[in-house]
Amino acid sequence: MSTLSVIIPTLNEERHVGALLSDVASQSRRPDEVLVVDAGSTDGTIEVVRRFPFARLLEGRPPVACGRNLGGRSATGDVLVFLDADVRLPERFFEDFFAEFERRRLDVACPLYATLDSTPVIEGFHALFNLLFKTVQRTLPSGAGHCLAVRRKVFRVSSGFDPKLKFDDIELIRRLAKGRRFGIVEQRVFVSDRRYREQGTPRMMLRYALMALVFALGKFAWANRIDYEFGKHEH
């Protein structure tokens, strides 16, 4: 059985990272290693992480790609799982996700996603994206970067996440999938709807639709022009 390393980059995530680490601790299949890479939080993120003795804290720096790369280089598991700090996991997520991951002999994979306590409009929008990801998984590999699993040997021979790009996760999926097995796995993670709440549902839906078009064209540098703020997650 493959060993699992979970990598969680953080920057001012005291309101969210504790819930994720609690979910990790409650998994029916516990990961073999949990790395939290903090990029200089000024809130209580560090104190929250230290309440979980199984989590190894690393000192990183912005942007998030640098934290992901540091975690990926430091991890020892056969499979690396990159998680955003505001993700929530069902109790059997790792067990069920990796049963399918191994059965399909995947090298790179993303789950489906949904939001907790969200509106029907947002849920319908996410369902549409899930369907899109599943439909194009062999021809145009894409996925929600909230959760990304990749075999360590595949990650190590790549240049990792590109810190020059805002959407480094999607670009890495596309790059790693070339000549390898990529798949969308039927298990779900739950993501925060905070961007919709803070910036408005119509505005965020328009941004995500624009991103989808840019990613379909493979113009990841163009996506840097999209107004999409990172690294200020105090809310």
Spans of features found by a protein language model:
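Acidic donor-binding loop at a coil-to-helix junction in glycosyltransferase catalytic cores
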Residues: 166-172
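Glycine-rich, basic loop-to-helix element that forms the pyrophosphate-binding segment
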Residues: 59-75
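Acidic helix N-cap motif at the loop->helix transition within catalytic regions
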Residues: 15-19, 43-51
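Short aromatic/hydrophobic "clamp" motif used to bind/position activated sugar donors
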Residues: 80
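Conserved donor NDP-sugar-binding/catalytic core segment of glycosyltransferases
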Residues: 92-121
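A conserved acidic beta->alpha catalytic loop
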Residues: 30, 38-46, 87
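Short, acidic, metal-binding catalytic loop of nucleotide-sugar glycosyltransferases
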Residues: 22-31
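Acidic donor-binding/catalytic loop of UDP-sugar-dependent glycosyltransferases
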Residues: 44, 85-99, 174
